[in-house]
Every structure is written in structure tokens, then in C-alpha cells.
Design a protein with these regions (language model features):
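S-adenosyl-L-methionine
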Residues: 1-49
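Conserved S-adenosyl-L-methionine
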Residues: 34-38, 42-111, 199-244, 257-287, ...
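SAM-dependent methyltransferase catalytic-core segment centered on the flexible catalytic loop
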Residues: 245-257, 263-330
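Conserved phosphoryl-transfer catalytic core
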Residues: 82-145, 283-300
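Short glycine-centered segments of the SAM/dcSAM-binding site in methyltransferase folds
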Residues: 52, 331-335
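SAM-dependent nucleic-acid methyltransferase catalytic core
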Residues: 135-260, 265-268
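Short alpha-helix
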Residues: 319-323, 346-358
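Class I S-adenosyl-L-methionine
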Residues: 342-343, 360-372
Length: 372
């Protein structure tokens, strides 16, 4: 296994400007994501066209999409239904013209649906004469199993909420609020009262059309074009189970490269901070936060004073790394981005734990520190 091959790798990937990459990467903001120039560097130097590139914790699909864009078979996996929706939309992209065609059909068939039974947590965010009825219609009309509908849903998650411009207009559907994550309903409710926030009447179909146009807009930069794009795949499984799935579908030792960032040791509530987007996807917040964890049994333990959370994390990572032994090709690489917690060097501590508790089938080449 390779966490970093050369001492210059952290510097080299930063030569590529993150804003020069395809806007598809920016479809929806996502917590704890790394920039596209990072996987681009590793994909460029440690794989070739038609190779399989895998990310078992794909998040919004940065590694998997960049691999597909570069002519590789990008495979993503994530238990978070929002992450699954986003990654799937990027590794199995429909044609732009087909997206517009579907939007036109949805617009023509639009009929206002009663919003009487929608929770106040949602109604406080949106205009109730046009915006919320349209959102509710799309929520019930779009089928996540259909790749065109899934892409539209993914794009819509990116404009569900966000900031307003100084002139009072917005590219988002909601009141003036952050875009990256959602504060709690009670916090938002009090914030609305405190700042006298008002809802703006937004045509969701128009916003979606503008968003789609922006996502596919190219500026003739090499990191944006989709000329070499090829279809990939996405799973919604536990990461270790996904290794077995890949071996079954693609064969033993079929993966050339892994670039991933496991969930932080300090638990991030992906459901809680995305409750508005999960409402759109018909997903329950509690179920997401219960499922999206690599150490379920330590959810109730807060802080890092007790060793149990770390040991559970490190033990899981050991089993995960060993599962990669069967899917990685000989002389292939796995780059693992691990975020430190406070003063703890999590990467080094995890590897030391693994070595002291049975070892790993993969070889560690290097551990380098870098600020992303």
C-alpha cells in the first residue's frame, strides 16, 4: 500500500489549480471533501487509460469522476445515500441534451401538489406559492434508479439552499443560508426571526436549467474536457463488502489504483448536516447517521479520551486494507488521505496499531504530512 510515493507528491499536485477542473466536481458542496487536483495527480502518474480506479469512501465522487473523465473506469462506493446519488450521477452521466429533454417533460407535466402536510422545518425555507410546490413535485416525480433523473436530483441537491447575492437574487431555492451544510431546524428558525429573513420566489425549473448549463460549460481547459470520459460504476455498501463485490464482478487483482479518504475518527453527522438534501431524496436523517459510520458500536462514545473509538477505527482500517490485497494488481498503489484529530497523528497511530495487532498484507511505502 502506498500513502505517498515520493516526498514531493504533496507539492506536485498543488501545481494544478482546483478551479481549472470540470464544474461537475462542484455539483454539490460536501463535508470533508478533497480537491480534484489531488486524485488527478495520482491517477495521471499511477494509472493508465482503461485501468480501474477505486474509491471505497467516494463522498461526492471526486476520485471516481476524475478517473472516468481521464478515460479510466472510475468506481465509487459510499453508504451515504446523498454521496451515492452524487457519485452515481458523475460516473454514469447522461447526455446533456437528454437532461434538458427530461426537464422539459417534467416542466410540461407539472401540476401543483398540496404542501399542507410538509413539515414546518421545510416550509420555513421556501416560497410556498411556486418554489416549494415545484420541489415537492420533483421530489415525487424523479426516480433515483433512472440515470437522467438521478443526475437531475444530484444537481438539485446543489441548489437546495445557499447564500443570496447583495441585490437579493440567488441561484439557490431557499432563504439566505449556508450552502455547504444545513444547521439544525431550530437554529435556522431562530436565525430567520433574528435577521428577518424572507423567502424569495424561485422557479426551480429555471434554476435547474441554469445549473445544468453551468455544470457542462467548458472553458477549453485540459482538466475540464470530457472527450475521454468513460462510464464507471458506484456501489452503496460497507467498504469491506465492496472489496468483495469488486472481486466478484471485475475479478481478483483487477484494480490498478485506490485513492480515498476514510471518514474522520471524530464522527461527522453526514445526515444531520444534510437533512434538507436528504428530505429531497426521501431519506431519514437518523438512518443515515446510524449507517454511515465505519465503527457503528462507538457512536455513543464522545471525545477521544477513551481508546475504544480509535481501536475500533484502526481495527476496521486493518481489515479494509487487507481486503484490498485481493483486488489490487501487483505493483499497484493505494493512496489514503487521513485527517488528523487534534494533536493525534492518526495515520501513523493507525499503522502502528495495525503492525502491533497482526500486521497488514499490504506494504507501507511512506506517510507524509500535508495540508489540504
Amino acid at each position: 500500500m502506498n500513502v505517498n510515493v515520493s516526498n514531493t507528491a504533496p507539492i506536485q499536485y498543488k501545481r494544478y489549480v482546483r478551479n481549472d477542473f470540470s464544474k461537475i466536481h462542484q455539483m454539490t458542496a460536501y463535508l470533508a471533501m478533497f480537491p480534484p487536483n489531488l486524485p488527478y495527480f495520482f491517477i495521471k502518474h499511477y494509472s493508465k487509460i482503461n485501468d480501474i480506479v477505486f474509491d471505497p469512501f467516494s463522498g461526492r465522487g471526486t476520485t471516481a469522476f476524475e478517473a472516468c473523465r481521464m478515460g479510466r473506469i472510475g468506481i465509487g462506493n459510499d453508504l451515504n445515500p446523498l454521496a451515492f446519488c452524487l457519485t452515481k450521477s458523475k460516473v454514469n452521466m447522461p447526455k446533456e441534451k437528454n437532461i434538458y429533454k427530461r426537464l422539459q417533460t417534467l416542466k410540461q407535466n407539472y401540476q401543483k401538489i398540496s404542501i399542507e402536510n410538509i413539515s414546518e422545518d421545510i416550509t420555513m425555507l421556501y416560497d410556498e406559492t411556486l418554489t416549494l410546490p415545484q420541489l415537492f413535485y420533483l421530489k415525487h416525480s424523479l426516480n433515483k434508479a433512472n440515470k437522467i433523473d438521478n443526475f437531475i436530483l444530484a444537481a438539485l441537491t446543489g441548489i437546495m439552499h445557499g447564500k443570496h447575492r447583495k441585490n437579493g437574487t440567488s441561484m439557490y431555492c431557499s432563504i439566505d443560508m449556508p450552502n455547504t451544510f444545513s444547521m439544525s431546524p431550530n437554529y435556522i428558525k431562530n436565525f430567520i426571526k433574528m435577521h428577518s429573513l424572507t423567502k424569495i420566489k424561485q422557479d426551480v425549473f429555471e434554476l435547474l436549467e441554469q445549473r445544468i448549463e453551468w455544470l457542462f460549460r467548458e472553458r477549453n481547459k485540459p482538466f475540464e474536457n470530457l472527450v475521454n470520459y468513460r462510464k464507471g460504476e458506484c456501489f452503496c455498501l460497507d467498504a469491506i463488502k465492496c472489496s468483495k463485490k469488486i472481486m466478484k464482478k471485475y475479478g481478483k487483482n483487477s484494480v490498478q489504483l485506490i485513492v480515498t479518504s476514510p471518514p474522520y475518527l471524530k464522527n461527522i453527522h453526514y445526515g444531520k448536516y444534510n437533512w434538507i438534501r436528504l428530505w429531497l431524496l426521501n431519506e431519514e436523517v437518523k438512518n443515515v447517521d446510524k449507517t454511515v459510520s465505519i465503527y457503528h458500536k462507538t457512536q455513543s462514545i464522545k471525545g477521544l479520551k477513551d481508546n475504544l473509538p480509535f481501536e475500533s477505527y484502526a481495527s476496521y482500517m486493518q481489515n479494509l486494507f487487507n481486503s484490498w490485497y485481493n483486488i489490487l494488481k501487483p505493483k499497484s498503489y493505494a493512496f489514503v488521505v487521513i485527517g488528523d484529530i487534534g494533536t493525534q497523528n492518526l495515520a501513523k497511530d493507525t499503522w502502528q496499531f495495525i503492525q502491533e495487532n497482526g500486521g497488514c498484507k499490504l506494504n507501507l511505502i511512506n506517510i507524509l504530512e500535508d495540508l489540504i
